[in-house]
Amino acid sequence: MSNIVWHQHAVSKQSRSELKGQKPLVIWFTGLSGAGKSTLAGALEQALAVEGKHTYLLDGDNVRHGLCGDLGFDDAARQENIRRVGEVAKLMVDAGLIVLTAFISPFRAERELVRNLLGADEFVEVFVDAPLAVCEERDPKGLYKKARAGEIRNFTGIDSAYEAPKQPEIHLLNAGKPVAALVDELLTALRQGNYL
């Protein structure tokens, strides 16, 4: 790796940020499958688009169709999945974007890795907190049913651990509130934290 150097661009991250009129950052949604991460990230992206913000949503399922299509779901593969996503998110932040990510990202260490990669001022952890029973009841993809039947191994919340964030920047309880109300909570918290 000693022959590889980082190429400095003539247009800086700050210049890109100023051109877009926004502060680039990553809004990292984490929580169990079925907690509402993708739904909330998508709704927040729509709200930010209405405000003229330049965004991109990296969704766990979509990323596994390409960038991380070669990975499985054991602990090592999950960690590599999040490492890759973190690197892509960092490049997008450098481009001046507000990046929303929706990944179970079950391990604190992998989320901290991404936080450290970006820096504390460019990483907002959003814990979408829904009880396991609620997630199983929702089960939009039928994955909990398959995991309970033994058809899926290493499924977070069933036979693989989820390590809830200890101090997320934003903690959303999602056990029945309308999506619009949760997006309002998100926007308020992001503004109060000077992230937007």
Swiss-Prot record:
GO terms for molecular function: adenylylsulfate kinase activity; ATP binding. Its EC number is 2.7.1.25. ATP binds at residues 31-38. It is an enzyme of class 2 (transferase). Pathway: Sulfur metabolism; hydrogen sulfide biosynthesis; sulfite from sulfate: step 2/3. Keywords: ATP-binding, Kinase, Nucleotide-binding, Phosphoprotein, Transferase. The active site is at residue 105. It catalyses: adenosine 5'-phosphosulfate + ATP = 3'-phosphoadenylyl sulfate + ADP + H(+). Belongs to the APS kinase family. Catalyzes the synthesis of activated sulfate. This is Adenylyl-sulfate kinase. It comes from Aeromonas salmonicida (strain A449).
